[in-house]
Amino acid sequence: MSHGTYYECEPRGGQQPLEFSGGRAGPGELGDMCEHEASIDLSAYIESGEEQLLSDLFAMKPTPEARSLKGPGAPSFPHYLPADPRPFAYPSHTFGPDRKALGPGIYSNPGSYDPRAVAVKEEPRGPEGNRGTSRGSYNPLQYQVAHCGQTAVHLPPTLAAPGQPLRVLKAPVAAAAPPCSPLLKAPSPAGPSHKGKKAVNKDSLEYRLRRERNNIAVRKSRDKAKRRIMETQQKVLEYMAENERLRNRVDQLTQELDTLRNLFRQIPEAASLIKGVGGCS
């Protein structure tokens, strides 16, 4: 492939030829660098009329109508649309999902475009703006609290102001939403014995009478238990005495039996009678 088809443009007026610090590379070095490249001649697309067109574009000045739409420090742009002669009233809320606040006829007529009517959301600056944004943003914890607990969080439809706190309202337990987790179950109501219980003032007569009745009942139960214990101990003592008396009786009868046997052994007739009675029996 030939590498000699390079073109040099004629230097324009007021331009200095570029000079490189290094020496110009030889044909051999250029051939090594651009081995697989092709050069395109662009001189056919460049004419003298193009330079005049560019100079006319840069020399164009903005119209007085365009200047009226800009401030004193704004850059000059000649392609502004004419301003809307109708008076524009700024709405109180021009950002967020509520776009109807801008008015129904803003976008109906394409020729009545006013750059001031476009609502631009500004990012908060400083720590106060960050706190306001964080309050107005969606928080999954608030959703969980509103659906799983007895607390209802009411958020305003618009973004909350930096100094405006959120309102937290306590809802009754009966009207609260059912718990979404088995760990967050509502406490079961008390039994029927606790339903009729009411708070009584300790200085009232009813409270004193109730305490006195309770004390009397406690004393009666304690006395009854003591009586049962004493009765049991008395019965134990009685049984022990009866047992001792029976043992003494048994010993006495045993001694009498031994005495009678000795007497009958000393008398021979009595001994024969005893033997005869023993044989007949």
Swiss-Prot record:
Q: What is the name of the protein in this document? A: CCAAT/enhancer-binding protein epsilon
Please give the subunit comment from the record: Binds DNA as a homodimer and as a heterodimer. Can form stable heterodimers with CEBPA, CEBPB and CEBPD. Interacts with GATA1 and SPI1. Interacts with SMARCD2.
Quick one: where's region Leucine-zipper?
246-267
Superkingdom of origin organism: Eukaryota
Post-translational modification, as annotated: Phosphorylated.
> What Gene3D superfamilies does the entry give?
1.20.5.170
Q: What is its subcellular localisation? A: Nucleus
UniProt-recorded Gene Ontology molecular function terms: DNA binding; DNA-binding transcription activator activity, RNA polymerase II-specific; identical protein binding; protein-containing complex binding; RNA polymerase II cis-regulatory region sequence-specific DNA binding
Span list, region Disordered: 1-30
**SMART domains documented for this protein:** BRLZ
What does the similarity note say? Belongs to the bZIP family. C/EBP subfamily.
Domain bZIP: start-end pairs:
204-267
According to the UniProt entry, the cross-link of type Glycyl lysine isopeptide (Lys-Gly) (interchain with G-Cter in SUMO2) is at K121
Keyword set, alphabetical order: Activator, DNA-binding, Isopeptide bond, Nucleus, Phosphoprotein, Transcription, Transcription regulation, Ubl conjugation
Biological role stated in the UniProt entry: Transcriptional activator. C/EBP are DNA-binding proteins that recognize two different motifs: the CCAAT homology common to many promoters and the enhanced core homology common to many enhancers. Required for the promyelocyte-myelocyte transition in myeloid differentiation.
Instruction: Indicate yes or no for the key word DNA-binding.
Output: yes
- Report one GO cellular component: nucleus
